[in-house]
């Protein structure tokens, strides 16, 4: 999709950015989440987000099978929609087994989820106003439905300060689901490959770093 990918001189840099730098960036997302933010929401929004993420990922797998795509593609797209858009797509793609269409699937998912997220940033505040949601309800809706963090911030604060704050917290809670989702994927891959000579890692290192940085961020004021 990008002519630079065909340039031999660019490939090492692209490969570095798509692997090591990407995983470091995903791990650093953990610094944006604090336990105080989560507890401030209350248990109902937290439970709703957790259930929604699980259902969305599983729905992606089911719909992929229905349309003749692989479960890996369903996991990739479902995870991107459920968690944090392009960042989740690239993180999940980096731990899924590689196949001839891996790059195509990842590129499609990133482009599609970014386009839909931008469209949602523009249209969802109008939907919120049409349904007359209060600031908290609007924040939960925007943070729980828009894919990427930046678009959630843009949509939320275009409504009000309180809506933006709530939307951001809800969205970061979804980002926090990246760790358990990656863990679940790692467990499935580990079990499926346990009988082969090369067993898949139970949990990718950047997911462990993500969890550690969440704990560190909870103790620091950045």
Segments from the language model and where they lie:
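Cytoplasmic-side transmembrane-helix entry/capping segments in multi-pass membrane proteins
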Residues: 12-26, 45-50, 70-81, 104-112, ...
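Oxyanion-binding "anion nests"
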Residues: 156-204
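Transmembrane alpha-helices that form the ion-translocation and gating core
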Residues: 47-80, 120-132, 220
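Entry/N-cap segments of selected transmembrane alpha helices
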Residues: 24, 29, 33-61, 107-118
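Alpha-helical membrane segments and immediately flanking helix-loop junctions
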Residues: 69-119, 137-160
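Hydrophobic/small/kink-forming positions within alpha-helical transmembrane segments
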Residues: 54, 118, 122, 149, ...
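Structural signature of multi-pass alpha-helical membrane transport proteins
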Residues: 1-18, 28-37, 183-222
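Helix-coil boundary and interhelical linker segments in multi-pass alpha-helical membrane proteins
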Residues: 35-44, 100, 126-138, 157-166
């Amino acid at each position: 999709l990008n002519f630079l990918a065909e340039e031999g001189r660019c490939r090492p840099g692209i490969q570095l950015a798509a692997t090591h730098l990407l995983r470091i960036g995903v791990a650093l997302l953990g610094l944006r989440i604090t336990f105080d933010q989560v507890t401030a929401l209350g248990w109902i929004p937290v439970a709703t987000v957790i259930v929604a993420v699980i259902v969305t990922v599983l729905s992606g797998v089911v719909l992929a099978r229905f349309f003749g795509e692989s479960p890996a593609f369903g996991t990739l797209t479902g995870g991107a929609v459920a968690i944090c858009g392009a960042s989740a797509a690239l993180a999940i793609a980096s731990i899924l087994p590689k196949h001839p269409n891996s790059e195509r699937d990842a590129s499609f998912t990133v482009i599609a989820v970014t386009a839909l997220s931008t469209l949602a940033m523009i249209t969802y505040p109008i939907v919120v106003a049409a349904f007359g949601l209060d600031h908290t309800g609007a924040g939960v809706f925007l943070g729980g439905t828009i894919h990427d963090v930046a678009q959630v911030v843009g949509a939320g604060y275009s409504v009000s300060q309180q809506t933006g704050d709530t939307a951001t917290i809800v969205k970061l809670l979804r980002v926090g689901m990246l760790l358990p989702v990656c863990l679940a994927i790692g467990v499935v891959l580990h079990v499926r490959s346990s009988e082969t000579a090369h067993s898949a890692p139970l949990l990718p290192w950047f997911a462990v770093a993500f969890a550690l940085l969440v704990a560190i961020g909870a103790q620091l004021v950045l």
